[in-house]
């Protein structure tokens, strides 16, 4: 799922459930960082688009980077836009970053055959084709709708999501 907002559906559900303990902005940034390698692969014409970045090790390292740069960037953006929000803690940044990178790897493993998501533990991609691409997209969109409805409900009830 390169360069698509469909990855954001599960993030919206996580934000709705996790509240101030989950940064949706850092989650979104992690999605972008995860797809730098496939973008370079498309531009360069590589045979394998989803390489090391889409493995357990890659998700861990990119998650760490996403948390470290995502917290200060997100804090600055929210302040610049004067958006009322909970303080962005390191816990929220790390939760958003690591759920972002590991969910990205898992979702892409269902869709892309060129992955080795469990490397270095296992070679190959046993998850590919477990569900259809249409079912995967519906799942992600459904989670996004669920998350949005939950956030709206919390906002109406408490005045803050």
Regions found by a protein language model. Give the residues of each.
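N-terminal membrane-targeting hydrophobic helices
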Residues: 1-161
